[in-house]
Amino acid sequence: MNILILQGPNLNLLGLKSAQMKERLTLDKLNKKIKTEIKLQNIQLKFLQTHKNFQAINFLQRNRNKAKGLLFIPTSWARTNYTILETINLIKIKTSVIYFEHPYNFGTDENKSIFHGENIKSFTGQPVSSCVEGIKQFLKE
């Protein structure tokens, strides 16, 4: 099973955010922990972290027929990026949208997000656990 992981703007600064709390969680460490948590499953992950809307849309469109699901950490895109929402709805990909709890929150929570829909389920929590929970949703179906 192929899962796309789309990571939105400023998520590359996760290490900076965690350092303020005297922790050491970087984006690379988050990705490695996700891979470790699901390694016994028959899942292949394809990651993209970007600040650029067009790259995110290209990633979704080009991989739409190869992936069973999308794990999406929208960060600031959660409030305003209707183009990505439209793309998710058009390609009808099952989507887990991830929101980090405080202190890892990037400013937008599920209540302020535009990412809701028939194929979209939201998960809120600490970075690793919420991402793993979002991926496990695809195993249930």
Predicted regions and their residues:
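Short beta->alpha junction loops
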Residues: Q44-F54
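Short, acidic/small-residue loops that bind anionic groups at enzyme active sites
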Residues: I88-T108
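Extreme N-terminal starter segment of soluble prokaryotic enzymes
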Residues: M1-L4
